[in-house]
Amino acid sequence: MSTRKQIFLCAINNILSGTCKEDCKFCTQSVRYHADIERYSYKKIGQIVEEARQAKANGALGYCLVTAGKGLDDKKVDFVARAAQAVKAEVEGLNLIACNGTASLEQLIYLKEHGIDSYNHNLETSERYYPEICLTHGWQERYETCENVKSSGLALCSGGIFGMGESMKDREDLLSAIASLQPESTPLNFYHPNPALPIKTRNIGFEEALNIIRRAHTLLGEDRLLMVAGGRELLFNGKEDEMFKAGANSIVIGDYLTTSGSAPKMDQLMLEKLGYEVATSCDSH
């Protein structure tokens, strides 16, 4: 049996893009800022299944179905459930994650009954700083959705974004709030500036990002997935080994919601060169 550290790979599928009416200052999917991104209504379920099959072939264990918008409604929950059922029927071995905004306990139970394994809802930043990045909904609403996920029996995936102008205390408060939820997995995102967005610059560098990974690892524990997600290529390109040594054990492969990521083959070569194994089963964690 290999003793090499295993890295868990996750792929994201933006199945409804660029239609959100909220005012989150970090998000190109908001219609308020007119960012130059691809915007479209629901993808065909057959396309979602085919993209899931490709993600699995690229080594992904996690496959996240993401929709733009504040939260779930009847139409959205039905579509995500049907997409999940189709993926589960056609592609074996994927941990299906839904990321669809605020959600009630009843909606989350419905998704679980139709094949979703985990629900992603990020706290984004500290409760204190949240009004600086969003006014159309509150931080507490996000926290309550995470509590609903726990109550539903779904695994919780919850993290945040760093580098949006927040203070060091805000970062510590965010990580403490995430830890209080005891999520099974936590994505750490690092802000990717876009000229259309109100937040123009990123106030975080490589060493600070490493410290966030170390602190998250300490607070969350060894038995949780700690994923470096958005912004990885901006801060850790060529320095991925330090990221993993700091405690990260998961990355997103392929593209993000509206920005390009590394080609999956490049990530696989990087992991092989550094001496890590791609995890082949969620049971191994």
UniProtKB/Swiss-Prot annotation:
Pfam family, one: BATS
Gene3D superfamilies in the record: Aldolase class I
Native source organism of the sequence: Sulfurovum sp. (strain NBC37-1)
This enzyme's EC code(s): 2.8.1.6
Cysteines paired by S-S bonds: none
NCBIfam families linked to this entry: bioB, PRK08508.1
Taxonomy of the source species: Bacteria, Pseudomonadati, Campylobacterota, Epsilonproteobacteria, Campylobacterales
Gene of this entry: bioB
The UniProt record lists the keyword Glycosyltransferase: no
Subunit structure: Homodimer.
Alphabetized UniProt keyword annotations: 2Fe-2S, 4Fe-4S, Biotin biosynthesis, Iron, Iron-sulfur, Metal-binding, S-adenosyl-L-methionine, Transferase
Family under the similarity heading: Belongs to the radical SAM superfamily. Biotin synthase family.
Annotated metabolic or biological route of this protein: Cofactor biosynthesis; biotin biosynthesis; biotin from 7,8-diaminononanoate: step 2/2
UniProt-listed PROSITE patterns: RADICAL_SAM
Reported cofactor(s): [4Fe-4S] cluster; [2Fe-2S] cluster
Domain Radical SAM core: 2-223
Source taxon at top rank: Bacteria
Listed name of the protein: Biotin synthase
MF annotations from Gene Ontology: 2 iron, 2 sulfur cluster binding; 4 iron, 4 sulfur cluster binding; biotin synthase activity; iron ion binding
